[in-house]
Structure formats: C-alpha cells, structure tokens
C-alpha cells in the first residue's frame, strides 16, 4: 500500500495530522481505566486514507454553485471487533473532528477489526479491495499486510449488484412516498424520519450495488460522502453552497433519533418540501448510476460466457 501524501496540499496534510492525533487521543481515553482484557489489549493497528484524497481526484470548490468539497475518508483498523462500536469508543473523536477549528474539511471515518477487513477482502468486496489498492497508510502499529483480495467472477458481481439494487432502491422509493403522505397530513416528525430513511437507503443502494459494502451507519453525511466518492454525479442532489441548504441537510440527518425521541426536534414545512424535492433528484440519479453499473456488469458477464 502507498504511504506518501506528498500530492496533498501542505495545509490539508496538517489537517490530516490533527485528525490522526484526535483519533489516537480519544481512543486511548475511551480505554483508560478499563478492566476487561479486550479493552486493556485494545490497539489501533492501521489508519488508512482512502477515496479521492488517496487517489488524487479530490475536489475543493466551496464557492462554486454546488459548493462541493471532497471529504477525508478514513478507515481505522483495530484488533478486536468489540472496539468498532462507534457509540462506545469513537463518539468523542467524531465530535472533536466536527468542532476542531484546525480541521476545515469534513472527516468521515469507519472502524473495522483486522479480521473483518481481511475477511471482506477474501470474499471479494470491491470496497475494501479498492482501499487496499489505492489507500494510503497514515499510521500502522506494524507492517503486516492486509489479505490478498479475491477477484469475483463478473457473473457473481452482477448477481449481487442486481439483488442489492432491486431491494434497496425499492425501499428508498417507498420511504420517500410515505414521507410525502405524512407531510400532507402534518405529521412533521414522522415525515422527517421517513425521509431520512429514504436517503439512507438511497445512498446504501449505491454503495452496495457498486461496492457490495455499506457502513452500518445512520449518519447521512458518511453515507453521502462514500456514495458521492463512487459517482460524483450524486453530488448534484444536495448542493452545499448556501447555509440554508447545509442546515436543512443537518436537520434531516438528525431525524433518525431526534424526530422520534426528542421533544425539541423541529423541522419546517418549507425545509421538508425542499428536502423532498432534492430526495426525488437523488433517487433519479441513484437509478441512473446503479442501472449503468448493472448494465456494465451484464456486458462483462456476457463476454465471459
């Protein structure tokens, strides 16, 4: 795997260094005073930068009409699956990465155990194969390489992609319809929750169809970042140029929990209508992106028959 970040501008290299510092500090803090053996022995084995900043295809255009900026996408590999629980061990790191003023770019990170990553590679998951091929090691406890990836036959990739697309896209569409009905009868919080679920399923549809992987997360910012990394056309759905656009997305991102359980969650009819319109745009784009991918896999499978 690659180890140099020389292609990244110095200012962003400093932001990456700060990101590593925060991940290490907060993980160590989460494990201090631990009594369980797996916590005492808990270690970060590797931290890998992947996505556009690893591939040198990043975009940083915050002042254009779309306001698009590539995120830092990071894979943290730990030595025990129990340590991958974001709410238990990583929520403070997540919060600091959002609030730290030295880090201007959004940081989206996922955590997996070494066994999970190696198993995924052996099973031919394209998401992890791509990280192994294109990722940059920012930190490693030792230089033990990741497992060699298995290359799936085109027919098998086609089979899995088709199943994911058919199932997830239908669910995403249904949630959007239910959200619209809830809004029509002024069930605001229910409409927000259902729209969140539509977006979650839409982005997961892209990730599973194209890579056979989606993080176990309800955080729309993570799912959006990873999905847009697969196909930049998806960024057209949710512009970021204006504060009101970013604020609306933040409010719907909170809906998974707060729209159901918080007495203080509020979202306006105007925001929900705009978010519903943008979700419809996203669903149309997801349909195109996934259909294109399935068609390409079908052509590849036909050539091998």
Predicted regions and their residues:
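Metal-dependent nucleotidyltransferase catalytic core
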Residues: 2-34, 41, 58-121
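Terminal alpha-helical segments
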Residues: 7, 82-96, 101-305
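Charged interaction patches that mediate protein-protein contacts
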Residues: 15, 23, 43, 296-305
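Short amphipathic alpha-helical segments
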Residues: 17, 45-47, 196
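A general structural signal for short secondary-structure junctions and capping/turn motifs
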Residues: 38-40, 249-250
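Short gly/ser-rich loop at a beta-strand->alpha-helix junction or flexible surface loop bordering the NTP-binding
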Residues: 44-58
């Amino acid at each position: 795997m690659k180890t140099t970040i020389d292609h990244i501008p110095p200012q962003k290299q400093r932001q990456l260094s700060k990101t590593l510092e925060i991940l290490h500090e907060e993980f160590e803090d989460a494990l201090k005073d631990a009594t369980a053996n797996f916590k005492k022995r808990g270690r970060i084995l590797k931290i890998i930068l992947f996505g556009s900043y690893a591939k040198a295809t990043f975009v940083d255009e915050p002042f254009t009409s779309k306001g698009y900026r590539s995120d830092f996408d990071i894979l943290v590999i730990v030595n025990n699956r129990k340590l991958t629980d974001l709410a238990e061990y990583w929520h403070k790191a997540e919060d600091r990465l959002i609030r730290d003023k030295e880090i201007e770019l959004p940081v989206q990170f996922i955590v997996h155990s070494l066994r999970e990553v190696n198993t995924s590679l052996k099973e031919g998951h394209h998401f992890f194969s791509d990280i192994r091929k294109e990722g940059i090691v920012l930190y490693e406890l030792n230089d033990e390489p990741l497992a060699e990836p298995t290359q799936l036959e085109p027919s098998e990739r086609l089979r899995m992609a088709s199943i994911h697309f058919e199932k997830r896209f239908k669910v995403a569409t249904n949630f959007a319809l239910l959200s619209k009905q809830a809004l029509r009868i002024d069930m605001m919080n229910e409409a927000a929750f259902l729209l969140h679920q539509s977006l979650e399923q839409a982005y997961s549809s892209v990730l599973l169809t194209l890579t056979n992987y989606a993080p176990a997360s309800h955080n729309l910012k993570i799912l959006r970042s990873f999905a847009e990394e697969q196909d930049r056309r998806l960024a057209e759905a949710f512009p970021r140029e204006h504060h009101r656009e970013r604020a609306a997305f933040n409010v719907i991102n909170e809906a998974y929990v707060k729209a159901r359980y918080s007495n203080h969650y509020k979202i306006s009819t105007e925001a929900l209508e705009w978010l519903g319109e943008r979700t419809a745009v996203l669903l149309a784009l997801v349909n195109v992106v996934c259909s294109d991918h399935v068609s390409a896999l079908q052509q590849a499978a036909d050539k091998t028959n």
